[in-house]
Amino acid sequence: MKNIYDGLLSFKGEWRTYQQRVLREADAYMDDGRVHITAAPGAGKTVLGIELIRRTGKPCLILSPRIVIRQQWLERIRGSFFTEKAKTWEENEEQKILSSDIRYPGMITSITYQTLYSAMAGEKNVEESGEGEGTEEINFAGFEFLRQVKKAGIRTVCLDECHHLKNEWWKALEKFMDIEKDMTVIALTATPPYDSTPAQWERYTKMCGPVDAEITVPELVKEGSLCPHQDYVWFNCPSQEEGEKISQFRQNAANMFVFLMNDASLGEAAASHPALKDYEGYCDRMLENPGYLSGLLIYCQAKRIPFSRRWPEVLGVSEMPPVSEKWMEYFLQGFLYDDADSYQTDQKYREALKKQLREAGLTEKNKVHFLVNDKIEKMLVNSSGKMDSILKIASCEHTAMGEKLRMLILTDYIRGEYKSAVGHPEKDVGTMGVVPVFELLRRRGAGWRAGVLCGSLVILPDTAEEAFTEEILRIDPAASVPVFQKFRDAGGTAVGYSEVPVKGKLSLYTRAVTKIFERGYIQILVGTKSLLGEGWDSPGINSLILASTVGSYVLGNQMRGRAIRINPQDPEKVSNIWHLVCMSVPQEEKDRRRMGIEEPELSEDFYTLQRRMDGVLGVSYDGTVIENGLGRMQTIKKPFTKKHIEKINEDTACRSADRSRVAGQWKSALVKWNGREIADEFMADRKNFRPGVGFINALGVQIMIILGELLNIYLFLLRTGNASYVPFAGLTMIFLLLSYVSCGKIIRQLTPMWRFRGMSRGVLAALKKAGYITSGCEVISKEEDGLWFGTWLRGGTDREKNLYADTFAQMLAPVENQRYLLCHGGNVVRAKEYFCVPDIFASARDKAEIFRMELIPYIGKFRLVYTRNPEGRKILLHARAKAFSNKNERRRDRKKCVKGMLE
């Protein structure tokens, strides 16, 4: 088939090593009609996308999130791919090579997802043309979009950053792709939504296909496309006022717990639940929610209310734990809301109890909260103590960098109502936001030059006015001179800063502020993530504070991308990226016992940080490894007491000042990069793999196969008359039979690692048998720190590595609502051991059977159970109950790290 781009498009530059790697494998990725590439900021994903479009040789439709990105595609094609013939073609031919209007398509037509939606709906499309300046309007009434696509011969679709689209955009895109089924899809993103829900991820991969190739941050640092950098965390404890609110909440919970344990009416109501004595009649229903069932039984045990002993058995526990606030929360959720009709109690009593809990702050939106509520979590996320953290970080960085400091602080909100506090120290600025952060820096930072850049607000130091005006006139000689409105204190004295009214000139002012920031007239720039967190670049940034509450992988990586660009003016640039976390944990052992938690529950802020860091691949604090996750930041560890938090912060301040060490660690780690690859490693607690009946069964299968072969040889010798060999063969068989009888004792002494390694090989065998993995690759399994087993795929494509780790993780996942289970031992309903059939094998029984059969030599004979019929449903409920009671036993983890050939 003729390639329509021959002679018109040809890449003018030189492909970097990591780009060559992706392009070498691109043809293989295209086998299923989809290629999905993730590339860290700075990897040149746009030119990769253009090259892939060129290779398809067919007219293409490019879809982008915003107009500015839509235009960047066209500019990049003209600047990096247009040949002389293409330039002549554009001038003389009727059909253009490039277009941004689907009504008049070119060979390559670049539009936004919003335009696709409007064109599909046949309605007026109104979009901001970029950075809030003006709009672009097209009326698609009467326009036949699908007919135009067919007429233009468009057979390739390039999806740029196809994630977190508005729901109506998603629907339009899905409808379009359902109609145009034979399209070649090229999906490109810097930030795949790895942290999305399973349903969201399934929707995303159904559209884009599984990830085929990934260009990682370490590759870009090695090639000099990104600068060395390190992540740091600054912890704070709640302020006095916040601490008092937390203490009051916990005291309310403790008082309510004592009250409820002495409340005879609650005991009478609990005793009325018919399930306590009717196990057979209520088994299936109660097992739908094992947590609630456990809470009810634990409360009844504490109040000496009798119940069937079969309940603890089905939960897989020999003894119920003592009652605590945790279990009271489960019980009350059912009693008051989820299972209220099952209790014989006066409705007035129930309503009065609801009122008591609500007044104590222990219920929100029909949810019972004894450990922490949403209000407390939100307060901690927006803790005023983080303002003090920003000051301390700025002080550390200014001390270390001096005039070279170029710090960016990103927040969620402007908080323009605090402008009246600028220059008035008597006014409080304790709320997180652009203006409060700026004013705090102005008040406390003697000699710091701060500034603000937002969609509706620009604040500059008076010392930068002249430079700002010069930049404005340099960019646009016809522009009017900006107006500076000085901030003044109560006495009318100027405080050294002015507001510059934006008045529709945001694009111009953004460019000018960026320039004077890079020149040092502003050292600390404060802005919102919406304007500066994505699409805005200043290569001079060498320190970034993420004062945003956003925890998603996508936005977190977009914001980090601002700081790690190389700076041609500073070849030795090293960036620090700062994260803010507020910690609040019950410090007393007696508090934890009463609450029913073995270890302190960490704050939602901390879990947000964990989610962020799961999507970040970087060098560890000790410089020995490149991996993702919080584990590489070795100083961040328990106990998170106030004293230890202060110690962590002190260590962090010292580390952050030594940028040369960070550069050296990256250099050292990247020297070892040659011959290495990024491993997608799945890790599981070694306690999961105690040798047992299942493993003995597996070895038994292997021995029986050997015995069968020996029996065939023995019978063959008898038939052929080789009598001299018969006694030897007979003795061999007797020896192996005796060995088989005693193998149980032998195997029980073998290490759990043997079983884990066998399972890992079985998973790979199943994936190869089903045709999901076709390249030459091998499984590597090893024990880590004496606590974890890890496994990863060496060799193979990025997609295969990810698929292998996903499959193993799903096999060992807690039982919830999987379609198929593997069950071993016990009776028909209640097995001794369960494994989940991974999603990729669960779509049909024949696939699930492949998975089971390929695992037999490694884990023995397991029954395959379909959970969507009545019998399978019972097994699923029992398995789920067992998984809930033993949920800490199947601890799992996932990380990406650099592995060498000898590892």
Q: Where does each model-flagged region fall?
A:
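Post-DEXD/H (motif II) to motif III coupling segment of the RecA-like Helicase ATP-binding lobe
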Residues: 166-226
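Conserved segment of the helicase C-terminal RecA-like domain
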Residues: 562-602
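Walker A/P-loop
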Residues: 31-52
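Conserved C-terminal RecA-like helicase domain
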Residues: 40-43, 86-109, 143-144, 148, ...
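SF2 helicase catalytic motif II
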Residues: 115-116, 125-187
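Conserved Walker A/P-loop ATP-binding site and its immediately adjacent core
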Residues: 46-82, 114-115, 169, 192-196, ...
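Conserved pre-motif I regulatory segment
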Residues: 1-38
